[in-house]
């Protein structure tokens, strides 16, 4: 995978669902599985999986498999400028719907080992 470009990151944040996923992964500061993400965003699994695939293909997310579970996280090789952009989006969405609701649902989602 080549290095993340500004247009890759623009694609990632251009869709509201992808932005919600990225904000949640950034603010949670941990890996999340698909079931945690579907519960948190209150969306169906195929929609979440489609967006996760797009983010992974662009180099924004990385995965770790643990048996049947696939855990997603922001790619640890993201350039600093990209992390700063994601931090800006996370800061800009603080206290806003649906982001606050996503975080509240995540606090009660405990499906992965």
List PLM regions with ranges.
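Beta-hairpin "wing" of winged helix-turn-helix
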Residues: 57-66, 73-74
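Amphipathic alpha-helical dimerization/coiled-coil segments
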Residues: 1-4, 80-113
